[in-house]
Amino acid sequence: MTNVITRFAPSPTGFLHIGSARTALFNYLFARHHNGKFLLRIEDTDKERSTNEAVEAIFSGLKWLGLDWDGEVIFQSKRNDLYKETALKLLQAGKAYYCFTSQEEIEKQRQKALENKQYFIFNSDWRDKDPAAYPTDIKPVIRLKTPREGSITIRDTLQGDVVIENSHIDDMVLLRSDGTATYMLAVVVDDHDMGITHIIRGDDHLTNAARQIAIYQACGYAVPSMTHIPLIHGADGAKLSKRHGALGVAAYKDMGYLPESVCNYLLRLGWSHGDDEIISMDQAIKWFNLDSLGKSPAKLDFANMNSLNAHYLRLLDNDSATSKTVERLRQNYNVSKQEVIYINQAIRSLLVRSETLLDLVQLAQIYLVDSPIIYKQDAKEIIENCDKDLIKQVIENLNKLKQFDKESVQNKFKEIATHNGLKLNELMKPVRALITGMTASPSVFEIAEILGKENILKRLKII
């Protein structure tokens, strides 16, 4: 397959939805697999709802995911002259017509059909009228003259052939009375003008496909290959909504997910390559095809996503993991150079206990010796109920240690536990709570070796 050109065409009316990100990913992978082009089009014809902030959210979301597009971004708001020109050509060819029917009249017809329990298709009285009858005091819309007979077949690579009778397709508006193009016309003109060969999008667009094909045919354009993929659902099987969790790509970034894991997870939501779960971007480009798309809605599962993210976290080298951790810590703390060194020394033990960057950041706070330690509630309770004399004994013994490496510290704690008739883990519970502010953490002996005697004693003396 040669000269493949795909596109991602979001509307800038909010954040970059996770479902839209998957659509972008599939288009990106298909284009890259065939050494083709992946284009970006911003469908901003809805002036009231489109915002610059949403456009920036789309750009930043795609860049964060690593989905780089080819060429310049196309903005529909800057192309109305082309759409208008196309509508006028259809008018001159007798494939479109001026319609002067008001919205109020159309609504009356709709209500009448509802009352009679009839399927409503607007039939304009102006479809075949002589131009001599046109009123001069009303600005008309331009409507497509949809064929009344026959049918349109959507040849979908995933859904199969979907046949829609022309009698169920209305004479849709192409150009509004103010001269601006409708979404339907703009999409078709853009896809043709941009040379789009393959349209891959959510199956919520399937109902639009027949209407768009009617415009393609009227314009004499070749219809691109179409693939309508099932939408993402929540774990309960219902259509994805806010109650199922974060919906925007930026939210997943804020929640501590890595772009590599998000791409891997989205890829597996509706596409498969045998039993492979861990798939790098390079592998995805090599393997991606439309034949392996699923026909059933995929379910968003945070447990699987967390597991994938943990895998990708552990692939990070020490410096990269430290850098990502410190970057987030600095949103709330002044992190010193020495504290960065501590975190870097501890990073491997932190990574194996983390599923997200948020987990990593929380554990890394143990090594912020210049900031007050934050005690979790269960750690507070252990500290409040512990044997204060025992902690004083720990302080005295550790203070005498000349070597403060992991092994020496561990041996000293074993000695203290035996002397007091305690199991080692019984002794370590209050010690861990005091040193880390937590009840579960990396090895206290490792923490002691990294932070050194002075910092450890300082935390123990808080009691």
From Swiss-Prot:
InterPro entries: aa-tRNA-synth_I_cd-bd, aa-tRNA-synth_I_codon-bd_sub2, aa_tRNA-synth_I_cd-bd_sf, Glu-tRNA-ligase_bac/mito, Glu/Gln-tRNA-synth, Glu/Gln-tRNA-synth_Ib_cat-dom, GluQ/Sye, GluRS_core. It catalyses: tRNA(Glu) + L-glutamate + ATP = L-glutamyl-tRNA(Glu) + AMP + diphosphate. The keyword Nucleotide-binding applies. CDD domains: GluRS_core. GO terms for molecular function: ATP binding; glutamate-tRNA ligase activity; tRNA binding; zinc ion binding. One of its GO terms (biological process) is glutamyl-tRNA aminoacylation. It comes from the Bacteria. The keyword Ligase applies. It is found in: Cytoplasm. Keywords: Aminoacyl-tRNA synthetase, ATP-binding, Cytoplasm, Ligase, Nucleotide-binding, Protein biosynthesis. A motif ('KMSKS' region) lies at residues 239-243. ATP binds at residue 242. One of its GO terms (cellular component) is cytosol. Its EC number is 6.1.1.17. Its main location: cytoplasm. A motif ('HIGH' region) lies at residues 10-20. HAMAP family: Glu_tRNA_synth_type1 (MF_00022). PANTHER family: GLUTAMATE--TRNA LIGASE (PTHR43311), GLUTAMATE--TRNA LIGASE, MITOCHONDRIAL-RELATED (PTHR43311:SF2). Monomer. Belongs to the class-I aminoacyl-tRNA synthetase family. Glutamate--tRNA ligase type 1 subfamily. NCBIfam families: gltX_bact. Catalyzes the attachment of glutamate to tRNA(Glu) in a two-step reaction: glutamate is first activated by ATP to form Glu-AMP and then transferred to the acceptor end of tRNA(Glu). This is Glutamate--tRNA ligase 1. It comes from Rickettsia canadensis (strain McKiel).
